[in-house]
Amino acid sequence: MNTGIIDLFDNHVDSIPTILPHQLATLDYLVRTIIDENRSVLLFHIMGSGKTIIALLFALVASRFKKVYILVPNINILKIFNYNMGVAMNLFNDEFIAENIFIHSTTSFYSLNYNDNVINYNGLSRYNNSIFIVDEAHNIFGNNTGELMTVIKNKNKIPFLLLSGSPITNTPNTLGHIIDLMSEETIDFGEIISRGKKVIQTLLNERGVNVLKDLLKGRISYYEMPDKDLPTIRYHGRKFLDTRVVYCHMSKLQEKDYMITRRQLCYHEMFDKNMYNVSMAVLGQLNLMNNLDTLFQEQDKELYPNLKINNGVLYGEELVTLNISSKFKYFINRIQTLKGKHFIYFSNSTYGGLVIKYIMLSNGYSEYNGSQGTNPHMINGKPKTFAIVTSKMKSSLEDLLDVYNSPENDDGNQLMFLFSSNIMSESYTLKEVRHIWFMTIPDTFSQYNQILGRSIRKFSYVDISEPVNVYLLAAVYSDFNDEVTSLNDYTQDELINVLPFDIKKLLYLKFKTKETNRIYSILQEMSETYSLPPHPSIVKVLLGELVRQFFYNNSRIKYNDSKLLKMVTSVIKNKEDARNYIDDIVNGHFFVSNKVFDKSLLYKYKNDIITVPFRLSYEPFVWGVNFRKEYNVVSSP
C-alpha cells in the first residue's frame, strides 16, 4: 500500500461517513497493479478492516476503463454489496460508469455461463478486457465457479482481485488454487503440498513456500486492523492451551448414545455431522439418521421416555431437564442472570435448529415473530426472544439483522438471542453483542476467528469499556477432567483417539493454527509498501476524504485559509489548480459531516467558507426521491 497517502492524515476521525487511510492507500496499490500493470492481486485483509469498501471503490475507478464483474457467495451477501455500493458512490467524489459494473451471486453467474452443466465457451468473449472481483475467494474452489474462473483466466487473460481474510489459510489446497488462478503458470499441487495420513498433516512444503513467494511477488496486499477501539474479550471456563474452554460433562443418557454413535463411526468422526449432533444433544433414533426429514414425518414417535417427536415438533419433560444436552443445560442455567445480547454459533443447521427451537421454547424463551415460550421470561414488559439463522433464510435475514443491530435493541429487548449456522461467519456485522457462544466447535481456527469477527470489530460498540464474554463449550465424558496444557502431550494417535470429540476438534484447531500463523507471516512479509504521490486516478477521491476530515473540525474559515490550501496542495502541487479545486467544492456545495452541525454543505459567505446544516423535508405523499444521477449498478440475484 502507499504509505505516502497514510502520512497525509493526522488523527483521522472514523466516526463519520469516511474512507479510512489504509483503504485509500490500498486503493492506490490496486489501481497501479491491476489497471496499470494488468496483474492479479490477493487482498488479504483481516476481518473488520473494510475489504468490501476497498473493492467497491476500486470497481468505481476501474469502471472508467473496463467492465468490472463482482462475484459474491450468495444472495444475502449480494444485498450487502449493493447497499455498500451506494455508500462507496457517496464517498467517491469522482466520475464513474455505473453501467460497467455487474454484481452477481455465484449461482446466477453460473446460470449465465453454463448450458446443461457445460460451459458456454462462445459467451466468454464478453469478459474480454474486463476485471473480476471475487469476494470470499476461498469459497469458489472445488466447484463449478472455480472451474469457470480458471477457464476465464486462461481464455481471456484478465486480472482478478481476490478478497479473503483468514479462511484462505484453512488448507494448503485452497492456497494452491489461489496461486494457480493469480499466476500465469500451472501449479503441480503434488510438488507444493505435503500430505500425511491425517488432515492436520496436510501442509504447504518448502517448495510450496518458494512457489508462493516467486509467483505472487508484488501481488499481495496484507493488512490487519489495529486492536484499538475494541472491547476486551473475557474467555470463560478452564484453561485449555492458550485459551479457555467450558467443560460440559455429559449425563449418563447423553454419554450412552454418544458412545453408540461414535462406535458405529469408528475413528473417522472428525468431520462427521453425526458427531457434531450428539456432542450438542442426543435425540435417540435421530442420532444416526442421514435423512432427518424422514423421521420428522413421524407422529408421536418416542425418542426417550420423556421426549417425543410429532411431525417435526419435539415435546416432553426432557427439554427442561436437559439430560440430552450438557451444553444446553449449562447455557440455559447461565443465561438467566446475564444481561445484553447473545450470539450463538452452531454448525449443524437442520438437527441443531430443531433442538434449539424446542429447548428455548420449553424454557421460557419466545421465538421472534413466532411461538411464545412456556412461562415466558420478560424484559421491559416484553418476552425475551430468539431467532435461528441458517442458509435456508433468504429475504428475511436482512430484516432480522436490522432489528438485532438497531440501537433500540442494544439491551436485547426486541431480539436477545441470535443463533446462527455458518452463514453468519462471513460478510455480516453484528452490533452490541455481549455474549458469544460456540455450541459446536468450528472446523478451523480461521473460522473461529471469523465468527468472533462478526461481532468484535470496530464501530460495533458504543461502550468499549464493557467486556465481551466468550463461551467455547465442549461436551466431555462424565469423568473427563484432563488439563490440556501442551500440544506435545498429544502427538500419538492412541492418545488422541480416546479423547471426547469436542476436545479432539479443539486440538485440531490448535494444530492447524501453527500452519495458519506460518502462512500469515509469509503473506505479511510479501505485502509491499511504498511511498509515492497518489495515483492520478484517485486524486479526487483522496481530496474528498481530506476535505471531509478538515471540515469536521472547522465550521467556518476564511476563503483563503492557509491550512486548507496547504492540505489541498499536499496532493495538488500547483497552487492555482489547488485554488480552483477549492472553488469547485464550495460552489458545488460539497457534503461534509461537521462536529457542531452534523450533516452540512459548504457555502461561500462573503469572504468565508461556512458549513451549512441541512435537513431533507418532504410532503407526506412523496414516496421517494433519487438524489443521485448515477445509481444504476447492474446486478442480478
Swiss-Prot record:
Localization in the cell: Virion
GO CC list: virion component
InterPro entries linked to this entry: DNA/RNA_helicase_DEAH_CS, Helicase/UvrB_N, Helicase_ATP-bd, Helicase_C-like, P-loop_NTPase
EC number: 3.6.4.-
Primary subcellular site in the record, as a coarse category: virion
Top-level EC class: hydrolase
A single MF term (Gene Ontology): ATP binding
PROSITE patterns membership: DEAH_ATP_HELICASE, HELICASE_ATP_BIND_1, HELICASE_CTER
Keywords noted in UniProt: Activator, DNA-binding, Hydrolase, Late protein, Transcription, Transcription regulation, Virion
Entries under SUPFAM superfamilies matching the protein: P-loop containing nucleoside triphosphate hydrolases
Posttranslational modification: Apparently non-glycosylated.
Record text on subunit structure and interactions: Heterodimer of a 70 kDa and a 82 kDa subunit. Part of the early transcription complex composed of ETF, RAP94/OPG109, and the DNA-directed RNA polymerase.
Similarity comment: Belongs to the helicase family. VETF subfamily.
Role this protein plays: Acts with RNA polymerase to initiate transcription from early gene promoters. Is recruited by the RPO-associated protein of 94 kDa RAP94/OPG109 to form the early transcription complex, which also contains the core RNA polymerase. ETF heterodimer binds to early gene promoters.
Protein name: Early transcription factor 70 kDa subunit
Gene: OPG118
